[in-house]
């Protein structure tokens, strides 16, 4: 009996290890924009580095949530991750507006 229980537990645990997580990642930017191209590269790298155990599906152009709804969707746990214009939340915290200061970065890699 003990061997049977151990066997069932081993099979159940093996199924958990092989489980695949799927995340939806909304963006307010259109599919052909620089921002979404970066997100696609990120999703591809996550897929590769996790051995396919985490799949991220992009939803550009407000196809899952409108741009002004995305931040709230993350806050309420409706999606695990998202991309949105951080400076749009500068009224909540002035630091969120740093990315909209012109000429702060001198290059893409800066």
Label the predicted regions.
Residues 1-4:
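Positively charged n-region of N-terminal signal peptides that target proteins for export
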Residues 22-24, 29-110:
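Short, glycine-/small- and polar/acidic-enriched structural segments
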Residues 14-18:
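N-terminal signal peptide c-region/cleavage motif recognized by signal peptidases
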């Amino acid at each position: 009996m003990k061997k049977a229980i151990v066997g069932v537990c081993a099979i159940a645990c093996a199924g958990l290890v092989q489980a695949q997580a799927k995340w939806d990642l909304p963006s307010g930017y259109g599919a052909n924009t620089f921002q979404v191209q970066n997100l696609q590269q990120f999703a591809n790298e996550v897929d590769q580095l996790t051995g396919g155990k985490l799949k991220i599906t992009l939803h550009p152009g407000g196809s899952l949530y409108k741009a002004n709804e995305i931040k709230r969707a993350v806050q309420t746990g409706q999606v695990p991750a998202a991309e949105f214009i951080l400076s749009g939340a500068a009224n909540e915290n002035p630091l969120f507006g740093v990315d909209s200061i012109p000429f702060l970065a001198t290059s893409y890699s800066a």
